[in-house]
Amino acid sequence: MVEGRAAPRGRTLAASSPAGTIAGLGRFNAIMALVHLVQAVALLLLSRDFRLPVTLSYLKFDPATTSLRPMVTTVAEVPLAWLVVAFLLLSSLAHLTIATVYRPRYERDLLRGLNRARWIEYAVSASVMIVAIAMLVGIYDLGALLMLFSLVAVMNLLGLLMEVHNQTTRQTDWLSFWIGSLAGIVPWIVVAISLWASSSYGDGQIPAFVYWIYVSIFIFFSCFAVNMWLQYRRIGPWASYLYGERAYIVLSLVAKSALAWQVFAGTLRPV
């Protein structure tokens, strides 16, 4: 160990966290796998066939005006229910994996103040969530959707980097946190611009549930960053990494459930 370097976070955690608490998290993951799966199956069975287009924008030469004109073509129509079911199933699979085959590695990582599996799952499931929200507000361009997906994925992978990198630092290095926060806020700005454009230049008839989705899921996404901040500041019960881990699991369930059932109530329920 480099002289003057503080002990790794995991050593303090290992000394202060009873094994029973870690075992409890294993069982909690198994329960969460079932809860997400039940919701996914219910939504798949109950939802009507509501599809949104995926488009491509391109330039085409107009011989009449001898200029290039922007064009849009629809390349696919995606059932919205599939997107909702996808992020629920991804979470269910991740929790099941953590509770079973990955559990020994998961428990070792928890003792070090680390959870790789969480960030990898979020990098995919949260990215699908933002794509669903973007399509609800009228963002259909494939390139734009891919960029939004990628930004949220990068945000979560920087969360992974934050935990891995700070295994070896004397003091918490917040660079990954702030870059991840920057990447994570951009999709919400893009969605807000689309909402504003629809209100200003469209017919202004944006369903109220779309605004509720935007506000509620933005708040939930922000709570993940707050949870990490509290963990690394060791404030109150967050002094134990396991408390923050349980908070992540609960936040993930609530955020995904809130989005899924708001989308169902607004667009997918049978009429």
Residue ranges and their predicted role:
Residues 3-34, 38-115, 126-271:
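Polytopic alpha-helical membrane-helix bundles and their juxtamembrane interface segments
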